[in-house]
């Protein structure tokens, strides 16, 4: 309702008419609210900003929020299935152009991160041999178009290197991931 990129509203179970709605997360032109998971003491939001799917954790008692820092410039993340309401641990999936599809448990109180599973990349892949960057090209209409690149660390970068464009920007396209073939 009145929010192209979505917004989050709350109401009581007994008074559900629109006049009783209270805004929890407002509409933002530059952020698309994609998904959420409710826990006893936390609200976890999956949102897209600048083409990247990130995770935002709101501590319900204090109202403070934090964005998980994945330590890479290009990535995608999704809230996984979390069946337990009374927990402070959220499970999510993560991948990037360097990191294979991974499942993590994150303790929303202590900040402890535990890798639960990671897809194997066969053939001797070592992500430490590669770099990943996020650049922007300016389109004819003046909009910034994100470009995610990955290259071997020993590559000599020069101003006029060629670029293979894998995908054109679509509204809901998130591609920064390793393709396992």
Predicted features along the sequence, with ranges:
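Beta-propeller blade signature
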Residues: 9-12
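Short beta-strand element of the alpha/beta-hydrolase
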Residues: 160-169
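Non-catalytic accessory segments flanking enzyme active sites
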Residues: 23, 34-35, 46, 53-58, ...
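Beta-rich catalytic cores
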Residues: 4, 32
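Conserved small/polar residues in nucleotide/adenosyl-binding loops
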Residues: 171-177
């Amino acid at each position: 309702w009145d929010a192209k990129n979505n917004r989050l509203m709350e109401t009581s179970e007994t008074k559900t008419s629109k006049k009783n709605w209270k805004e929890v997360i407002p509409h933002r032109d530059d952020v698309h609210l994609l998904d959420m998971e409710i826990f006893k003491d936390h609200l976890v939001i999956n949102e897209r900003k600048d083409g990247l799917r990130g995770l935002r954790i709101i501590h319900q008692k204090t109202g403070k929020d934090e964005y998980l820092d994945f330590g890479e410039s290009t990535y995608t993340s999704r809230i996984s299935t979390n069946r337990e309401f009374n927990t402070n641990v959220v499970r999510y999936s993560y991948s990037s152009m360097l990191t294979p599809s991974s499942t993590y448990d994150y303790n929303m109180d202590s900040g402890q991160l535990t890798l639960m599973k990671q897809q194997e990349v066969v053939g001797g892949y070592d992500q430490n041999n590669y770099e990943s960057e996020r650049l922007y090209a300016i389109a004819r209409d003046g909009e910034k178009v994100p470009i995610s690149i990955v290259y071997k660390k020993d590559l000599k970068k020069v101003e006029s290197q060629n670029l293979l464009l894998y995908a054109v920007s679509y509204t809901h396209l998130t591609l920064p991931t390793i393709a396992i073939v």
